[in-house]
């Protein structure tokens, strides 16, 4: 086949190995059978996109309808490390990282569990994962929440519920904790209380925020409970190298330290209890080993925590992963919400993008497992009932509790 490349050069492409790879789309959930030949599917005058790999082998490509956004931040300083607003700036100036506000889906759950842990619940608390019907006046209907698997798992510890992203337990947890108390707590991360829904659907991430804000709020977990203000620009210099702008938010502290010749001793302020931050992060680290984020194991690092997110009908998917040095969140979906397909989840769409980004830079990121804060103890428990383990118990493990 003869094609015209982006440099207006006419080249010949061997397409004999491509035909077997082409399947026409029927809908978001189905593909047709392999085409028999190019001429049976394409016509003269059709515009076909090709792309080549490093070996100059060509394959059929598409200009995607689906979009994505990525925000990467240093959770200690707030410096933005990377920001991607979409597939192509030339085709769309819309910055999805900043302007889009897709629903969070299950990526919201760590915030709810943090509220629970700071209000009397703990990772060993048992909540029954069983069918339940809520009559919610704000939803104006009876609501029967379901897990993504369609199954129910019986009495479940909150640790297991978060790392396996169980919907039913999460909704029951919010119902027990209370919507008003939860909304008050969420303002500590930066959520606007009056914008949050007044119904139980908030438990499953019915609220939408930008990927940029999601990265900012998640940084509280990565930063040991402390909130940061993101910074885009550190300094600007002119063509002659003269500094014409410098971010001065830490300038007075730095100058004073230089004058007195030693670091200032500052009282740290926390948005949330550092013990809560540690416990949530510990659960999300475990989620990367045996939960919904286990594909992270490909990095061969155990200091990263992560949480997937999938909204109702798979209209938006998320993955947020972090350690103390870097936090990156990825959103994946359409500008005008519609289903990505029944088999698409945060683990199959957003997580691979996160992983591709991290694989390029992971060797430069310092190994940084979270430090256990004061007044947090580990106790051996019976994993079936969450109670202190007895000498005769077989199914046991350690869990963290506030001292």
PLM regions and their residue ranges:
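Active-site SXXK
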Residues: 77-78, 101-129, 161, 217-221, ...
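Short acidic, glycine/proline-rich loop/turn micro-motifs
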Residues: 92-97, 140, 197-200, 339-343
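Conserved catalytic neighborhood of penicillin-recognizing serine enzymes
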Residues: 76, 121-180, 227, 240-279, ...
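Proteins synthesized as precursors that undergo proteolytic processing into mature forms
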Residues: 41, 89, 117, 124, ...
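Short active-site loop at a secondary-structure junction
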Residues: 30-39, 63-68, 91-111, 124-130, ...
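A penicillin-recognizing enzyme superfamily signal
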Residues: 2-72, 83, 90-93, 164, ...
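Mid-domain, small-residue-enriched loop/turn segments at the edges of structured enzyme/sensor domains
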Residues: 140-146, 178-216
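Extracytoplasmic/secreted proteins, especially bacterial periplasmic and envelope-associated proteins
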Residues: 103, 111, 115, 122, ...
């Amino acid at each position: 086949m003869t094609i015209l490349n982006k440099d207006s050069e006419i080249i010949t492409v061997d397409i004999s190995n491509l035909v077997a790879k082409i399947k026409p789309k029927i809908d978001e959930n189905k593909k047709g059978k392999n085409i028999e030949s190019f001429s049976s599917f394409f016509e003269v005058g059709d515009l076909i996109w090709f792309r080549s790999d490093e070996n100059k082998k060509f394959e059929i490509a598409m200009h995607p309808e689906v979009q994505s956004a990525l925000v990467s931040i240093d959770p200690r300083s707030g410096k933005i490390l990377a920001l991607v607003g979409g597939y192509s700036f030339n085709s769309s100036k819309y910055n999805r990282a900043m302007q889009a506000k897709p629903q969070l889906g299950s990526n919201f759950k760590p915030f709810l569990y943090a509220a629970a842990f700071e209000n009397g619940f703990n990772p060993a608390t048992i909540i029954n994962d069983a069918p339940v019907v809520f009559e919610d006046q704000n939803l104006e209907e009876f609501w029967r929440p379901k897990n993504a698997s369609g199954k129910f798992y019986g009495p479940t510890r909150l640790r297991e519920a978060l790392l396996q992203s169980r919907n039913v337990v999460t909704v029951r947890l919010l119902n027990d904790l209370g919507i008003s108390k939860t909304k008050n707590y969420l303002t500590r991360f930066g959520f606007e209380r009056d914008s949050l829904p007044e119904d139980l659907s908030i438990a499953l991430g019915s609220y939408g925020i930008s990927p940029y804000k999601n990265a900012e709020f998640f940084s509280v977990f990565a930063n040991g409970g402390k909130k940061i203000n993101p910074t885009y620009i550190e300094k600007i210099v002119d063509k002659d190298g003269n500094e014409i702008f410098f971010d001065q938010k830490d300038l007075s502290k730095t100058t004073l330290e230089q004058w007195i010749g030693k670091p200032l001793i500052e009282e740290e302020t926390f948005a949330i209890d550092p013990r809560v931050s540690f416990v949530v992060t510990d659960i999300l680290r475990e989620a990367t080993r045996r939960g919904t984020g286990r594909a992270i194991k490909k990095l061969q690092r155990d200091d990263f925590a992560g949480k997937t997110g999938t909204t109702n009908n798979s209209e938006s998917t998320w993955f947020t992963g972090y350690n103390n040095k870097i936090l990156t969140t990825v959103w994946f979906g359409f500008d005008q919400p519609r289903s990505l397909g029944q088999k698409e989840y945060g683990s199959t769409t957003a997580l691979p993008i996160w992983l591709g980004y991290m694989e390029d830079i992971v060797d430069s990121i310092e190994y940084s497992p979270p430090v256990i804060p004061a007044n947090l103890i580990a106790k051996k428990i019976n994993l079936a009932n969450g109670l202190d383990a007895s000498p005769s118990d077989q199914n046991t493990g350690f869990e963290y509790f506030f001292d």
